[in-house]
């Protein structure tokens, strides 16, 4: 299959690197408005550099769109005109209204997916298998200050990863949304089936954190998106008396997780979906709902 990447910033370079390693990719093309950056990357990974998006599309069966969010609508619109399958980096557009308008122009017969990368992190499926009766859920996604400019608030930039997992893998209809924060730091409390769920995201942290924490009826689950480790803390069911204090010793279990690079899983899945004409796991409809929820979060504080 002939694949292209439009946009070779931080994330786009990773798309190029992985596509260049996939046996299912016959040829790889790239385009970026920064011609020098595109040329250097093309030489590094054996990719053909094209002078325009149109030229790239003429030589591609499917493309990744990895340009800044504010340009998604324009660039993806060009892809739709050429009727090429496309993987759009998250968020799908700057606003849910813009995304809905964009998708009205999607032609039939192509695959359209959205790159919510953490959906492909193996800890998500492992935790989903373990959870039985959740009592409390918390997800933290904190970043140190970065020079990378996204044009989005911390909600659409970082928290949207956890929103995507929450809405599409665990709870369909959160309500009673309360949020506190600003463009760079946000905390949200919501009600999911009478379960308190807390999300927090920051672009001002001193430490990078990617945590998933669930208190279940009989155990507590801790998942780390970065190390791809899942730990279960179980109650032994009995207490010991020690120096006039009740002491409970938990039983700790490490869950065996098959570690993978989530982006590689995502891109391999996209290629397979295009080949087999099957829906990509993260649909535009889900991505739009994620954005709508982000907008609710920002409006709730």
Where are each of the predicted segments found?
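N-terminal Rossmann-like dinucleotide-binding module
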Residues: 1-44
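Beta-loop-alpha module in the N-terminal Rossmann-like domain of NAD(P)-dependent dehydrogenases
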Residues: 15, 45-103
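Conserved acidic residues
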Residues: 28, 61, 135
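Hydrophobic residues in well-ordered beta-strands that form the structural core
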Residues: 51, 88-89, 112-114, 223
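A contiguous active-site-proximal alpha/beta segment in oxidoreductase catalytic domains
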Residues: 93-147
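Mid-domain beta-loop-alpha active-site segment that forms a flexible
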Residues: 115-122, 144-175, 286-287
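Contiguous beta-strand/loop segments that form the cofactor/metal-binding neighborhood of enzyme cores
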Residues: 160-229, 233, 257-276
């Amino acid at each position: 299959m002939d694949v292209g990447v439009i946009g070779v910033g931080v994330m786009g370079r990773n798309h190029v690197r992985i596509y260049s390693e996939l046996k299912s990719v016959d040829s790889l093309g790239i385009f970026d408005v920064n011609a020098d950056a595109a040329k250097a990357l093309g030489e590094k990974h054996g990719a053909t550099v094209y002078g325009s998006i149109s030229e790239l599309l003429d030589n591609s069966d499917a493309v990744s769109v990895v340009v800044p969010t504010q340009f998604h609508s324009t660039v993806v619109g060009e892809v739709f005109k050429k009727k090429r399958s496309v993987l759009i980096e998250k968020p799908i557009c700057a606003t849910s209204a813009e995304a809905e308008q964009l998708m009205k122009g999607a032609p039939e017969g192509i695959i359209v997916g959205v790159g919510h990368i953490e959906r492909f992190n193996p800890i998500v499926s492992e935790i989903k298998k373990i959870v039985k009766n959740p009592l409390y859920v918390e997800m933290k996604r904190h970043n140190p200050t970065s020079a990378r400019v996204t044009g989005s608030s911390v909600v659409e930039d970082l928290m949207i990863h956890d929103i995507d997992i929450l809405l599409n893998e665990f709870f369909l209809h959160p309500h009673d949304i309360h949020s506190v924060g600003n463009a760079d730091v946000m905390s949200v409390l919501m009600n999911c089936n009478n379960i308190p769920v807390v999300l927090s995201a920051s672009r001002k942290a001193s430490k990078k954190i990617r945590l998933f924490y669930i208190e279940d009826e009989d155990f507590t689950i801790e998942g780390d998106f970065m190390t791809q480790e899942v730990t279960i803390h179980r109650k032994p069911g009995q207490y010991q008396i020690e120096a006039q204090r009740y002491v409970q010793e938990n039983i700790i279990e490490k869950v065996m997780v098959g570690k993978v690079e989530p982006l590689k899983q995502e891109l391999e899945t996209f290629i397979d979906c295009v080949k087999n004409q099957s829906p990509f796991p993260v649909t535009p409809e889900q991505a739009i709902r994620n954005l709508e929820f982000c907008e609710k979060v920002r409006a709730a504080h």
